[in-house]
């Protein structure tokens, strides 16, 4: 039978044993990829600076997912939060990777066994002696088991009752750690940034899944519904499964891109909207304002700003700045961050404090414009010097740094002032090492961007797959040219008027 490549799955259409085999093999491939990818990432990951060179800057993709579920230690003696450890235990990063690879091998062997021994008694219909699957019962079994797993995850793993808990952090991604979470049963549980909602929703959804599974195991579908939804056709299962997968993919693409308690910024990097809304900048200025209200000096209050918070307020960490087809980690783009130079404050010769307008997300170049506290333009770096009125030289702009490596240093040289004004467009100013990785200076996206793009793309593809297979199973008889009234239509003289079923001849 010469099947084209896009129809090869036809061979398992009426073969339950080998249908099971190919699904087990698929699980083996997925699990094997996850374990292998984890080992590769651990081989290239540098845990030495969790503040300025975190996992998301290094382009780690599977390590963040392990970390948010409670894995923080490595057999290499390091912890993701910094420092060294002596007893990481079996459930370290390497332990999880190894477990996936072992599981992959077992699934591989099981798939081969089920491929060879495909003609099992369990798949045989006693009445007909032909291979058959009781799909409604299988649906009930899967619903019950997945509900059990969902409930167990929410009630035991997340709450810490039997498990480590999950990664929980503050709104600014500064104090993150793995901890147990109490379920949030009030309206606050519907806030996507409240970790307690993860526990309560898994418990609730798991309970519903268990009850629904038991219902489908004990109640048979009505005949009309069974036939109407084509419940006896395996392609119905394929269509509805694809629907579940694409719906989940759309949901997680949204929670990843817009941010939620399930996608902490310490593990996946900031969202683009935190740059667009000046989220971290506002918090920095709030802290500075609070310090100044206590009569502390500018140098003191800016020195108290956590380097981690300042680093979030840098456009190079915006996932929307990197092109989708620019391969490599963020570190391969603008370089490895070495240190915060401090916060630059610009002043004109009249002593007014000036603020550099920040570059919007979707600009590659942007004019350097300095405004005062009222938003009035006071200085710029002109495109045409002959017509300039507000150039740094004419206005006499100076810059002084507070906090960071250049604390207390000031510059009045126009070339230096303009250099730092340009860099201030990109947020807080950092020293970046571009030599180590031969970084090219072109911004890259973070794993947050890759995950969103991948899942949104596949969700769209799977949506069309759902429509395709759903239509095939619902209209299978029509596509095959089989119509319930076909025999009556072609019978000579069946209708008084050819093809008009309302004029059926009466038998005398």
Curated annotation (Swiss-Prot):
Principal localization reads: plastid
Q: Name one Pfam family in it.
A: PSII
Q: Belongs to which family? A: Belongs to the PsbB/PsbC family. PsbB subfamily.
According to the record, the segments passing through the membrane are: 21-36, 101-115, 140-156, 203-218, 237-252, 457-472
The protein depicted here goes by the name: Photosystem II CP47 reaction center protein
Subcellular localization, as worded in the UniProt entry: Plastid, Chloroplast thylakoid membrane
The protein's role, per its UniProt record? One of the components of the core complex of photosystem II (PSII). It binds chlorophyll and helps catalyze the primary light-induced photochemical processes of PSII. PSII is a light-driven water:plastoquinone oxidoreductase, using light energy to abstract electrons from H(2)O, generating O(2) and a proton gradient subsequently used for ATP formation.
What cellular component GO annotations does this protein have?
chloroplast thylakoid membrane; photosystem II
Instruction: Name its species.
Output: Ranunculus macranthus
Entry keyword annotation includes Plastid: yes
Q: Keyword set for this entry?
A: Chlorophyll, Chloroplast, Chromophore, Membrane, Photosynthesis, Photosystem II, Plastid, Thylakoid, Transmembrane, Transmembrane helix
